[in-house]
Regions:
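Auxiliary Fe-S-binding modules of radical SAM enzymes
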Residues: 152-156, 166-306
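Conserved G/P- and acidic residue-centered "switch" motifs that form tight phosphate/ATP-binding loops
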Residues: 42
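Short, solvent-exposed loop/turn segments at secondary-structure boundaries
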Residues: 10-13, 106-110, 173-177, 263
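Short, flexible helix/strand-to-coil boundary loops that buttress conserved ligand/catalytic motifs
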Residues: 1, 82, 109, 251, ...
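Canonical Radical SAM [4Fe-4S] cluster-binding loop centered on the CxxxCxxC motif
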Residues: 1-17
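Radical SAM/AdoMet-radical enzyme domain recognition
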Residues: 14-37, 46-164
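A short, flexible beta-alpha/helix-coil linker loop
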Residues: 4-8, 100-102, 168-171
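Short, small-residue-rich loop/turn micro-motifs
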Residues: 1-4, 97-99, 165, 251
Length: 306
């Protein structure tokens, strides 16, 4: 979080609940979406999130299945809503946690709320939901010394930790590929104290490379998302819908289509399907981070959704 904060999206620009549900319905019943993830920004800021999840869980795809529903959150206030989210139909959850040290957490988030995040993690564990994944971005000179402590914290609680290479989006001038902590660096640091074996689980379209991990009597899995050094673009099947109704075919895309504007100008469901499909078909072969002509997206991560 920049010291000066981020620009808040004006409320009239944000999709209404009915608009969100309409587009999610189209994605599931017309476009073949089988997994829906609510992310952000911070999805828990939406007081009606449980209602949207409930409506999503009631949808039926053409093959008779219901969509899998996941949530990515910073965990603030999660302890008070976890039960209701599960009751609404939430299947899986990812919680962002970049540090176990209060001062480091504060410097990264500009909030003295680490205890609230940990309470949210405890609430997720108590709810019985599985899997619970912890998302951690490792940054040089900030939290690279917490790679092993975070891994032990998660393994001892039955959580699946996912380390993520810092990407050139929302990082601005602080991102330098030559200085970034790579997936190889992370695996090297882990291997000094934790036993790692490549997982035999099929990766499919998942972004993380999985490792079986163990230390003392604790066993589990650790994932590493090497979006910069080992791009997985060829296996990516995601489409992103922003809070203000723009559809994007890549996290790093600079092109997007406003389904919100189409809806508010009377578009039919068929019109929306056609626009969404066209955007998906325009997906590039790769994100291009490692190309000399790469252009960093103008939207921050909080305005796109991870």
């Amino acid at each position: 979080m920049p010291e000066e904060g981020l620009h808040w999206m004006p409320t009239p620009d944000v999709l209404t609940d009915d608009e969100v549900i309409r587009l999610v319905t189209i994605a599931v019943t017309r476009l073949g979406a089988r997994s829906i993830r609510f992310t952000g920004g911070e999805p828990l800021l939406r007081k009606s999130l449980e209602d949207i999840i409930s409506a999503t869980s009631s949808l039926t795809a053409s093959d008779g299945s219901h969509p899998s529903i996941a949530l990515t959150t910073n965990g603030l206030g999660l302890d008070k809503r976890m039960h209701a989210l599960v009751q609404a139909g939430l299947d899986r959850i990812n919680i962002s946690l970049d540090s176990l040290h209060p001062q480091t957490y504060f410097s990264l988030s500009r909030r003295d709320r680490l205890d609230s995040v940990l309470a949210g993690i405890d609430a997720a564990i108590a709810s019985g939901i599985s899997p619970i994944k912890i998302n951690t971005v490792i940054m040089p000179g900030i939290n690279e010394n917490e790679i092993v402590p975070l891994a032990k914290f998660c393994l001892s609680r039955g959580l699946q930790l996912r380390f993520i290479e810092q990407m050139p989006i929302g990082a601005g001038r602080n991102w330098d590929k030559k200085e970034m902590i790579t997936a190889e660096d992370i695996i090297g640091a882990l291997s000094k104290e934790i036993s790692l074996t490549a997982s035999s689980q099929p990766r499919g379209h998942a972004p993380a490379e999985l490792w079986k991990a163990s230390y003392d009597d604790f066993h589990g899995h650790i994932g590493v998302i090497a979006a910069v050094t080992k791009p997985f673009c060829a296996g990516c099947d995601r489409t992103r819908l922003t809070a203000d109704g723009a559809v994007r075919n890549c996290l790093f895309a600079n092109e997007e289509v406003s389904l919100r504007d189409l809806m508010r100008h009377g578009a039919t469901d068929d019109d929306l399907v056609a626009a969404w499909r066209l955007n998906a078909w325009d997906k590039k072969r790769g994100h291009g981070i490692n190309q000399t002509d790469f252009i960093q997206p103008t939207r921050t991560m909080s305005a796109i959704g991870g």
